[in-house]
Amino acid sequence: MLSVIKQRDKEVLAHLPNKRKIAGNKAHLETYKKLAKYTVSASIFKFLSISHPCPLRAKTRLFFEVSLGNRIADCVMLTSCGETRICYVIELKTCMTSNLDLISDIRKSQRSQGLCQLADTVNFIHNYAPLGRQAWTVLPILIFKSQKTLKTLHIETPKFPVNLTHTSEEKLSCFLWSRADVEIRKKIHLAPKPKRIFKWDSLLDSTSTEHSAYRQKLIERNKKKCFTLQNQTSKFRDRTNKKSNDQLRARQANARPCKKKQHNNKRLRNNRKHGGKVSRLTTTTSFSSEAAFSNYPVSTHKL
């Protein structure tokens, strides 16, 4: 009976147009990005409409598109606050309209498919999670969200017989991290690159060029002003350089000692060391003595 229901649900969802599937994938990616942006655990619980015993103090870790056996869990969230440790396995279903009609065939098939996925993922975590001493409660949640506003329309927590596993936080986080989709992780955490503007885009642009022409005129005026200022500053620098060079030369000339050239053979007249004045006195005395002796008569005696 269950196999017949599963087959019918697959057929109903397979007949949906490709546009609906693409819109659903985009809504999933937007919800992942919004969850990754939150820094406080209380805002995450509010966005998902999930109740937690200590929403403000809980530590959260998110993993997206985790492959658990034959199933892929949309989101797995680990929360720990003291001794209360919960592993939320979240399955997202999106709707085009904001009004949820669970009686329709599409909503019934979405609900039954989501419950089957949650049952398989919970069993896989219970059987293949790494062993540890900490007790973790595995809590499956089915959430219906609007594609446009990402508002929660319906939430359901099914009860399965197995919902407790013994593991550790580090081991379980490594186990989920290794099984998460790498491409989805890059799309969520990496920022989009800015678009490059090529030359042919500017040729096809229909915007007016009045603003650009006015801007070009302003640029030319500024260039002229800059050129005149540069000339003025260069002239002022030349003047200051000339003045400084003249001052340096004058200082160097004053600092040099003035030395008169003297020949070794010649002697200075007024230099006492060489006896210039003494020679003059000797000559005068000699002449005066001769004059004195000339005044007195010389006696000549013949023997």
Swiss-Prot record:
Chief subcellular location: virion
Basic and acidic residues bias: start-end ranges: 235-249
The keyword Kinase is assigned to this record: no
Pfam family, one: Herpes_UL24
A single Gene Ontology CC term: host cell Golgi apparatus
Induction details: Expressed late in the infection cycle.
Locations listed in the record: Virion; Host cytoplasm; Host nucleus, Host nucleolus; Host Golgi apparatus
Bias-annotated ranges (Basic residues): 257-277
Record's keyword terms, sorted: Host cytoplasm, Host Golgi apparatus, Host nucleus, Late protein, Virion
Stretches the record annotates as Disordered: 235-280
Function statement: May participate in nuclear egress of viral particles. Plays a role in the dispersal of several host nucleolar proteins including NCL/nucleolin and NPM1. Since deletion of host NCL/nucleolin negatively impact on nuclear egress, UL24 supposedly acts on this process through its effect on host nucleoli.
Assigned protein family: Belongs to the herpesviridae UL24 family.
The protein's name: Protein UL24 homolog
Organism: Saimiriine herpesvirus 2 (strain 11)
Lineage: Viruses, Duplodnaviria, Heunggongvirae, Peploviricota, Herviviricetes
Gene giving rise to this polypeptide: 20
